Amino acid sequence: MKAELVVIGGGPAGMAAALAAEEKGIKDILILERDKELGGILNQCIHNGFGLHTFKEELTGPEYANRYVEKVKASRVKYLLNTMVVDVQGGKYLSLIHI
């Protein structure tokens, strides 16, 4: 599998980075996430306080993460779940384990 840009981690920062890269014109983007769903640690943060700066409203962690998940799903960004990066060689080649 080839990609112009690979983002390791499908939390909000990884998803935001992938979406920003797409806005800058990078066409072939892949997010690799070790968990069974995108969203990262925020899926466990049930308290309010997220999203005020980005979305102009107060959200729980899962709500905030879901906003980014929906943006990724509506974009051309691809993602692989249950996938761990175990090695990077020469800055270009990744060894993956699909769990």
Question: What does each model-found stretch correspond to?
Answer:
Residues 3-67, 71, 75:
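Beta1-alpha1 glycine-rich phosphate/pyrophosphate-binding loop at the start
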Residues 72-84:
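A conserved beta-strand/loop element that lines the FAD pocket in flavoprotein oxidoreductases
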